[in-house]
Amino acid sequence: MRSFFLLLLLSLTSIVNAQSLIGGKNILKTNLSSDALKNYNLTFERSLNRFMSVSLSYRKMNKQKLPLKALAKQFIENPAIDFDDFQIGNSAITAEARFYLGVSKMSGLYIAPYARMATFDLTVPFDYTYSPASPTPNVTLPAIPMHAELDGTIRSTSFGVYTGMQFQLLTKLVLDLWIIGGHYGTSNGKLTFVAPNGTPALALNELKKTIDQTKTAPFSLTTSTTSNGVVTDAAGPWAGIRGLGITLGFRF
């Protein structure tokens, strides 16, 4: 019986050691779920020991029309915003540490705390009207339709944790499934509109009133007029869900 357990222990040790060496200590991978939304990303992960690794990710989405308009309308309420021409782009750097609960290096169930810095490039179009001043008393001139596009960036810093499972499919091929997690932090930014020459001050004041009607709780917007346009400062908490990701990688 003792010989049997000794043989079993030696066999398990050999399996663990063999698995820990399969493919190498590094993995280069991309999230296929994110790629499908043209939000391209690349992650480099390196094993520190059997139970821990560190990784660094970069993602980039070129500016494009808003991909999830229905969802955005739930968080940004203003009938003057033209969501059909709303544009967004983003880039982010994410650093994380992974703690694997299995017996193989960079394989099995894991828990991963992470930190993320992101930048969002926005173009927010507004359609509004303003009534010009009448040179004749008691005469109201018809309202003039106007269009303005606010451009700028929002930057966020957040921290979170998520869980997932990573599988060694082949000697060099890895499948990483993000299950569920999330992050929380802060954000701030500025959007500006530079008016064409000759734009009346009344039109800029009306644009400010239109922007002030935007409901973006829990974010706060502070808008002011300038000599040639409008500036909107944005600030507030930043939260997000991380999960349901399918990532494929090359191990070396």
How should these model regions be labeled?
Residues L101-T123:
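Ordered, amphipathic secondary-structure segments that act as subunit-interaction surfaces
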Residues F51-V54, K105-M106, T171-L175:
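Repeated loop/turn-to-beta-strand initiation elements of outer-membrane beta-barrel proteins
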Residues S20-A36:
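Short N-terminal segments immediately surrounding and downstream of signal-peptide cleavage
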